[in-house]
Amino acid sequence: TSDNLLAADIVTSDGELRRASVDENPDLYWALRGGGGNFGVVTSFDFQLHPMDRQVIGGEIYYPYEKAKEVISFYAEYCQDMPDDLYVDLVIFAPPFGLKSALYLDVCYSGHPKDAARVLEPLRRFVKPLKDEIRPVDYVALQKSSDDSDPRGTGQHLKSGFVKTISKALVDTLIENLESNMLRGSMAFFQQAGGAIREIATSATAFPHREISHNLTIGAVWPSGLDPEPHAAWADSYWNKVKGFTDGFYTNDAYGVDPVQVQTNYLTTLDRLVDVKSKYDPANLFRINSNIRPRPQA
């Protein structure tokens, strides 16, 4: 999203409404694209749009959970050569109440319809799917298809980090430690990166993680009214087993992250971000976030 930001109106810590764009306050514009909520309250965004047909080829394709390691390994390889107009997430979910675990790919292909069968054919060939729901679908409907997946009255505890390679060791760790539980759902999912994300220079925005292949998220969900502690503790334990395979994290997903890790996560952009923070929020008013600390005031 930040790569398509053309401009923003933002109220900074001094109460001023400012315009941030290539032509106005370009330092602030640069920082907003990856620096999170450190610089003020944004009241409007201007985004670059991209022409596309409303109808795409998309949906979910389910596989036997017993084939999870094989499916994830295939997915990792398949993602390396897929076209930019194909986006595929992988989801593993162990539901509560002893229900059967699920494994599926969430697909959106926005290329030419005549090429869809050829591009998607490997997903249907390498392992026989349990259910194939990939079909022509309205793009907006596809975007809204998961709106009810996080209903009110549900607690959740998530952790995430970037991966550059989905290694065999990571696959083994994910599957062998995903725990079924009568009272909670347990999950892991990969969100695809790469593609156009890698085409932008690291210094062009405040987002430095251009070489990642995926964002990996793990977590637990449970009905409200239950004690959250054991479920959150399980998610933390699961994360501790897989976090060694990650390298950095998405700023908006940061929760309960050590402040030192937050600083190092900005990599080569940190010094420039600190300069912008010190200019627009020298007292660190906007600090309930992945906080960039301003330089000490004289």
Give the residues covered by each predicted segment.
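Soluble FAD-dependent oxygen oxidases
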Residues: 1-298
